[in-house]
């Protein structure tokens, strides 16, 4: 009998301690009806391979695939998609941790919302091995997601669950994307009209660490993000210049020097984009502006002149009650 959920995880060089916590958080889920497809993308590391083989020997739900060579995350995930036999597919990363009822709550969400194709969840962070409730709020409703996915990916990738029928219909990760393969896939799905949603509560602990992203890798991520955003805008008949694209991905540039001047240029660009998006009946301008404000506030927190940058944010738009609440929440989150 086929499992209800196929969990897919790719393993490369994650520390065994992190890997153990991640695997255990799946195996001890309150929802038991799943298969766990683990793709080892580091076949030359006998320690990792043997570690995973031990787990496979003690839990029949684990299906272990050892790639013949290092194939990269995108291809490894597509291997997992081909093997998935469950009604739903859940993503998981090898260094993150699921909360006990993650699978149960996402299955219930998709069962109760048959119009939704892809479901994510909110997240807590693990920073230097400590849980931190950092500022991160994802939109829950499809209309809000459609209105804001140009600015950022709508999901935390390892929190996502989606319907396996999508794979049978031909959906998979684009292997031309070394990074941001999830954002590229969600963008194509959204543009095709598929509906998305997020469970409001955090159901995973998402691990980050100082120095986690090298400048070299970040440069690759930025180029992938530029291609994705350019394709989104092209589908909306908007031609964007290379300099504008570089500005649009400024919030994700880890080594960027953020000045008030650059923040203002970013604000002008997204304001102009908002005017263009007003012509798109699927875009809710209030949701778009709220996400712009969140992004501006995050840029302000990195600014070389925080006071002048923050004052600019206050005058960026006529602030609604919701926007004022957003600013207040942001300030509190940085203090607590």
Q: Where are the regions that the model predicts?
A:
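Nucleotide-sugar donor-binding/catalytic module of glycosyltransferases
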Residues: 1-223, 227, 335
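C-terminal subregions of glycosyltransferases and related glycan-biosynthesis enzymes
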Residues: 208-336
């Amino acid at each position: 009998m086929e499992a209800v959920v196929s969990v897919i995880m790719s393993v490369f060089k994650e520390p065994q301690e992190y890997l153990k916590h991640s695997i255990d958080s799946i195996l001890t889920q309150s929802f038991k009806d799943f298969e766990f497809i683990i793709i080892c993308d580091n076949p030359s590391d006998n320690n990792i391979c043997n570690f995973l083989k031990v787990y496979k020997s003690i839990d029949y739900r684990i299906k272990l695939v050892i790639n013949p060579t290092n194939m990269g995350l995108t291809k490894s995930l597509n291997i997992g998609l081909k093997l998935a036999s469950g009604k739903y597919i859940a993503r998981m990363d090898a260094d993150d941790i699921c909360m006990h009822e993650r699978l149960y709550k996402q299955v219930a969400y998709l069962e109760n919302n048959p119009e939704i194709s892809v479901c994510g969840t909110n997240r807590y962070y693990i920073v230097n091995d400590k849980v931190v409730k950092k500022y991160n709020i994802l939109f829950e409703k499809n209309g809000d997601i459609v209105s804001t996915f140009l600015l950022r990916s709508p999901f935390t990738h390892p929190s996502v669950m989606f319907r396996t029928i999508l794979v049978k219909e031909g959906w998979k990760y684009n292997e031309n994307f070394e990074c941001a393969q999830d954002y590229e896939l969600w963008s194509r799905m959204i543009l095709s009209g598929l509906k998305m949603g997020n469970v409001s509560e955090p159901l995973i602990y998402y691990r980050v660490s100082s120095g986690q992203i090298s400048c070299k890798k970040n440069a690759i991520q930025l180029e992938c993000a530029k291609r994705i955003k350019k394709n989104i805008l092209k589908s909306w008949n908007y031609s964007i210049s290379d300099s504008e694209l570089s500005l649009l991905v400024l919030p994700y540039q880890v080594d960027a020097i953020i000045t008030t001047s650059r923040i203002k240029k970013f604000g002008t660009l997204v304001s102009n984009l908002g005017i263009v998006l007003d012509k798109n009946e699927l875009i809710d301008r209030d949701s778009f502006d709220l996400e712009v404000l969140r992004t501006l506030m995050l840029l302000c927190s990195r600014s070389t002149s925080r006071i002048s940058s923050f004052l600019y944010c206050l005058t960026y738009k006529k602030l609604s009650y919701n926007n004022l609440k957003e600013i207040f929440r942001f300030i509190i989150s940085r203090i607590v």
